[in-house]
């Protein structure tokens, strides 16, 4: 009787150990790509969050980013001083102040997206058709993992 030989199945811990450093390095490269725009990766991340949630308050932003409210206030103050965000009274509750990305902040975010996309696309062009298809196939399940 011949034993059926199958390819070993990757377990979650093995995949996580291989994927984690790749994602960290990719994130580091994408953050470096915007250095010349005068914003840090963390500032760009906050701007994108505020852009997705116009009118978000400092406390809500701090909770979302898992930071203290006083710490977030400092980051928000720097973004405001740089002219990248504005504080506006809420339309529902005038006592509440919300954050919005300013026109200059929108310009910076367009540049951030453009540079990061160009950098990543240049590297993806170096893959074979099958490798590119494999990366494309992996995007949806990875997105589901982080959306949970």
Q: Model-predicted segments: where are they?
A:
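Charged, amphipathic alpha-helical coiled-coil/dimerization segments
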Residues: 55, 77-140, 147
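A short, structure-level motif marking secondary-structure boundaries and short turns
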Residues: 15-16, 32-33, 42-44, 59-62, ...
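N-terminal helix-turn-helix DNA-binding core of bacterial DNA-binding proteins
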Residues: 28-70, 82-84
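Short, structured helix-loop boundary elements
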Residues: 12-16, 20, 40, 69, ...
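Generic structural concept
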Residues: 16, 20, 43, 47, ...
């Amino acid at each position: 009787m011949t034993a059926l030989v199958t390819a070993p199945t990757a377990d979650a811990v093995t995949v996580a150990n291989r994927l984690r450093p790749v994602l960290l390095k990719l994130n580091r490269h994408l953050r470096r790509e915007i250095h010349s725009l005068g914003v840090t990766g963390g500032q760009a991340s906050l701007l994108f969050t505020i852009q997705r949630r116009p009118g978000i308050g400092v406390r809500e932003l701090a909770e979302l980013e898992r930071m203290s409210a006083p710490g977030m206030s400092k980051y928000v103050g720097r973004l405001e001083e740089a002219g990248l965000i504005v504080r506006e009274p809420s339309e529902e509750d005038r006592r509440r102040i919300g954050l919005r990305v300013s026109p200059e902040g929108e310009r910076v975010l367009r540049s951030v997206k453009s540079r990061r996309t160009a950098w990543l696309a240049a590297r993806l062009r170096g893959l074979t058709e099958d490798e590119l298809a494999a990366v494309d196939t992996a995007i949806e399940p990875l997105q589901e993992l982080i959306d949970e």
